[in-house]
Curated annotation (Swiss-Prot):
SUPFAM superfamilies: alpha-helical ferredoxin, Nqo1 FMN-binding domain-like. Its EC number is 7.-.-.-. One of its GO terms (biological process) is electron transport chain. This is Ion-translocating oxidoreductase complex subunit C. Residues 556-565 have a biased composition (Low complexity). Coiled coil: none annotated.
Length: 704
C-alpha cells in the first residue's frame, strides 16, 4: 500500500525493511506552546556533553561568569561548553551525569545570581559575507552539537563533509513515542529553523536540501509549508509514520532510496543529516551570536500534572524541571531520560540536563505495565522481521551471551541502532537491547586496549630507534674527533709490533732438554736483564763524556778482590787458625759491585781518555773463573763445606754485572757495543764455568 501511495506522489519516497507501530502517546505534550522554566539556584555543567574528548578548562573556582561565557576551550573535536546563566563558580568536581549507570564526570558547578546577564553578543546577520571556514569555526566554538540524540560536534561534521555532499537532509521525523520537542519547536520557531537550514546549505553547497517529517505532525507541516511557500531551494517530504523512520540510515533510505553500507556513514553516499533542533541552534550561533545554553525538553507522562515542552537551561537538575511540571511520584516511580524505547532509567534525579536530553518521561505504574519475566528464546524470528537494520538479533543475542565477540562483530553488531524494535516484539520478553549495548561496550573496551597496546609498542619502537640514532651519532662524533698518531708515534708502534713478533718467533722455537740435566733458567733471566738494560740505555738523555781509566777496570778489580779473599782464607788455614766461614758467592758479588762502583767513581775523577769498552761476556767469564777458584780453594782447605752455589743466582749476578758494565760503557761516551745475544751470553757463561773448573784443577796440580 505504501508503494502504491508513493507512486502517485510528486516527490517519490522509499521504504525500509522492518519497523513497528507502537502507540504514539504524543498528544499529552504537543498541544501547549513552549514555555520558560524559572532558573534553578544551582547548575551542574558536565565538560563532556558530546562525542569526543572534553575541552580544556578556562575558569577557576571563585570566578564570576556570565551567560554564554565559555567554560572550556574547544580544539579539534573537543567541543566547548558555556555558562547557562550568570553566577559564581563554586566547584569543579566529578558529578553524576545523564548515563544509565550515573557515571561521575568532571563538571563545573555554578551558583546562579538571578540576574541572568549575557556576555556581549556579536551576530553575523549577513552570514554570506563570511567564508565557509569562518562559519564552521563559529559554529564549533559556540558549542553546537547534534541535538537529535547522538551529540556529534556539528562543526566537525560539516568540516568532514567537504565537497562530496550532494544531499542535505533535515531530520524532522521524531518517530519515538511520547517525544514532541522537535514538533513543538517547528510549530513555534519554523522561520528560525529554515534560516538555520539555509546557513547549513550555504556551507555545504549541496545539490538538494530535503526535510523529512512524519505525517503525524500536521501543525508542524503546516508551519513549515507556510515558511517555504516561495522557496525553491528546500523540499519538504512528508513520510508515513513508522518506527524508527527517524534513524539516520532509515530516513536516508526513505528519502533517497540509497542504503548506507555496513560499517559506513551516510557521507559515503554523499548525504549529510542534521536535526531540526541543530538547525535552530546554528541560526542562534551565527546570526544572533548566542552559544548553545538551552534546548527544548519534553516533560511528559501520567506522573506529571502539567506536561509540555519547555526551554531548559543546560545544567538544570532533572528534579527542578519535574517539580515545575507538577511531578507526583509514586512509591516505585521511575523517570526515563529519552523515549520509552531508546531511553534509560535515571538512578536519581539530581543529574543535569545536557545537550542530548530531549525528553523526561515520568510514567505511572499502569502506564508502563508490570515488568515481565525474561524467558528463553523460542527462535520465532520475530526480532529479525522487525529489525530496521537488516540484522539477526537472535544470533547476536546468542553471541552476546556466549562472549563470542568475533562472531558478533562479523554479524555487524556495530550497525545496531538500539531502537528497541526487536525487544518490543519479543514474546519471551528478552531485553535484547541491553545485551547488545553490553556486547558493544565490551568490544569497544577490547579495541581500546588493543589500540593502547599498539600505541605503547609504537612508542617503544620509536624510543629504540631514537637510541640507535643517538648511538650512531656518538660513534660518528668519536671517529671524527679521533687524532691520527704522529710519525714518531707510528715508528714507536712499529717497533713495538716488531718486538712482539720477535718474542713470538722466539717462543715458537723448540726447547731441547738433555738427559740428566737440571732446569736452568739462566738464559731466560739473562735475556730479560739484557732487554731491561737496553731499554735503560735508550732512555739515557745525556751520556757522560768522561771515559774510564784502563787501569781501573771494574771487572779486573772484582777478580783481584776475589783472588785476595781466597788467598787470605788459604793463609789462615795454613797458619792453623780456626776454619773460616765459607765464601758466600752473593756477598762476593756484592763486594765486587762495590769495588766496581769505587772504580767508576775514580775514573770520573781522573778525567782521562776513554778506555776500551768492557765486553760483558768477558766480564762474566772472569767472574765465573773467580767463583771456580774460590770453590776449589774451599775444597782444599778441608773446612766445613759452604753453601752450594745456585747456578740461577750466579747467572743473575752475571747478568747484573753485564748490565752495569754496559751502562758504564754508555756513560763514558764511547760508541755502543753490539747488543749481547742472551743465548750467546748464556753459552759463554757455561763455557767460562767449565774453563774455570779446569783452571782450578790445573792450579792445584801446579801447587802440588
Amino acid at each position: 500500500m505504501l508503494k502504491l501511495f508513493s507512486a502517485f506522489r510528486k516527490d517519490k519516497i522509499w521504504d525500509f525493511d522492518g519497523g513497528i507501530h507502537p502507540p504514539e502517546m504524543k498528544t499529552q505534550s504537543n498541544g501547549t506552546p513552549l514555555r520558560q522554566v524559572p532558573l534553578a539556584p544551582r547548575f551542574v555543567i558536565p565538560l563532556k556533553q558530546h562525542i569526543g574528548a572534553e575541552g580544556e578548562l578556562c575558569v577557576s573556582v571563585g570566578d564570576r561568569v556570565l551567560r554564554g561565557q565559555a567554560l572550556t576551550r574547544g580544539r579539534g573535536r573537543m567541543l566547548p561548553v558555556h555558562a547557562p546563566t550568570s553566577g559564581t563558580v563554586i566547584a569543579i568536581a566529578p558529578h553524576s551525569t545523564a548515563h544509565p549507570s550515573a557515571l561521575a564526570e568532571l563538571s563545573v558547578i555554578i551558583d546562579a545570581d538571578g540576574e541572568d546577564r549575557w556576555i556581549e553578543r556579536e551576530g553575523w546577520s549577513d552570514y554570506r559575507a563570511h567564508s565557509r571556514e569562518a562559519l564552521i569555526e563559529r559554529i564549533h566554538q559556540y558549542g553546537v552539537a547534534g541535538l537529535g540524540g547522538a551529540g556529534f560536534p556539528t562543526g566537525v561534521k560539516l568540516q568532514g563533509g567537504g565537497d562530496k555532499i550532494t544531499t542535505l537532509i533535515i531530520n524532522a521525523a521524531e518517530c519515538e513515542p511520547y517525544i514532541t520537542a522537535d514538533d513543538r519547536l517547528m510549530q513555534d520557531c519554523a522561520a528560525q529553523i529554515v534560516e538555520g537550514i539555509r546557513i547549513l546549505a550555504h556551507i555545504l553547497q549541496p545539490r538538494e536540501v530535503l526535510i523529512g517529517i512524519e505525517d503525524n505532525k500536521p501543525q508542524a507541516i503546516s508551519m513549515l509549508r507556510a515558511v517555504l511557500a516561495d522557496a525553491h531551494d528546500i523540499s519538504l517530504r512528508v513520510i508515513p509514520t513508522k518506527y524508527p523512520s527517524g534513524g539516520a540510515k532509515q530516513l536516508t533510505q526513505i528519502l533517497t532510496g540509497k542504503q548506507v553500507p555496513h560499517g559506513g556513514r551516510s557521507s559515503d553516499i554523499g548525504v549529510l543529516m542534521q536535526n531540526v533542533g541543530t538547525a535552530y541552534a546554528v541560526k542562534r550561533a551565527v546570526v544572533d551570536g548566542e552559544p548553545i545554553t538551552e534546548r527544548v525538553v519534553t516533560l511528559t507522562g501520567e506522573a506529571v500534572s502539567r506536561p509540555g515542552n519547555v526551554w531548559a537551561r543546560l545544567g538544570t537538575p532533572v528534579r527542578h524541571l519535574l517539580n515545575d511540571a507538577g511531578f507526583c511520584p509514586s512509591a516505585d516511580q521511575m523517570v526515563i531520560m529519552g523515549g520509552p524505547l531508546m531511553g534509560f532509567t535515571l538512578p536519581w534525579l539530581d543529574v543535569p540536563v545536557v545537550k542530548i536530553t530531549n525528553c523526561l518521561l515520568a510514567p505511572s505504574v499502569a502506564e508502563m505495565g508490570a515488568p515481565q519475566e525474561e524467558k528463553s528464546c523460542i527462535r520465532c524470528s520475530a526480532c529479525a522481521d522487525a529489525c530496521p537494520a537488516d540484522l539477526l538479533p537472535q544470533q547476536l543475542y546468542w553471541f552476546s551471551k556466549g562472549q563470542q565477540h568475533d562472531k558478533a562483530t562479523a554479524h555487524h553488531i556495530a550497525d545496531c541502532i538500539e531502537c528497541g524494535a526487536c525487544a518490543w516484539v519479543c514474546p519471551s520478553n528478552i531485553p535484547l537491547v541491553q545485551y547488545f549495548r553490553q556486547e558493544k561496550a565490551e568490544i569497544n573496551a577490547i579495541r581500546l586496549e588493543e589500540k593502547r597496546a599498539a600505541e605503547a609498542k609504537a612508542r617503544f619502537e620509536a624510543r629504540q630507534a631514537r637510541l640507535e640514532r643517538e648511538k650512531a651519532a656518538r660513534l660518528a662524533r668519536h671517529k671524527s674527533a679521533a687524532v691520527q698518531p704522529a710519525a714518531k708515534d707510528q715508528d714507536a708502534i712499529a717497533a713495538a709490533l716488531a718486538r712482539v713478533k720477535e718474542k713470538q718467533a722466539q717462543a715458537t722455537q723448540p726447547v731441547v732438554i738433555q738427559a740428566g740435566s737440571q732446569p736452568d733458567n739462566s738464559a731466560v733471566i739473562a735475556a730479560r736483564e739484557a732487554r731491561k738494560a737496553q731499554a735503560r740505555a735508550k732512555q739515557a738523555a745525556h751520556p757522560m763524556a768522561d771515559s774510564a781509566i784502563p787501569g781501573n777496570d771494574p771487572s779486573k778489580a772484582a777478580v783481584e778482590a776475589a783472588i785476595a779473599r781466597a788467598k787470605a782464607r788459604k793463609q789462615e788455614q795454613q797458619a792453623g787458625s780456626e776454619p773460616v766461614e765459607a765464601v758466600d758467592p752473593r756477598k762476593a758479588a756484592v763486594e765486587a759491585a762495590i769495588a766496581r762502583a769505587k772504580a767508576r767513581k775514580q775514573e770520573q775523577q781522573t778525567g782521562s781518555e776513554p778506555a776500551e769498552p768492557i765486553d760483558p761476556r768477558k766480564a762474566a767469564v772472569e767472574a765465573a773463573i773467580v767463583r771456580a777458584k774460590a770453590r776449589k780453594q774451599e775444597q782444599q782447605t778441608g773446612s766445613e763445606p759452604a753453601e752450594p752455589i745456585d747456578p740461577r743466582k750466579a747467572a743473575v749476578e752475571a747478568a747484573i754485572a753485564r748490565a752495569k758494565a754496559r751502562k758504564q760503557e754508555q756513560q763514558t761516551g764511547s760508541e755502543p757495543a753490539e747488543p749481547a745475544d742472551p743465548r750467546k751470553a748464556a753459552v759463554a757463561a757455561a763455557i767460562a764455568r767449565v774453563q774455570a773448573k779446569k783452571a782450578a784443577q790445573q792450579q792445584v796440580v801446579n801447587e802440588d
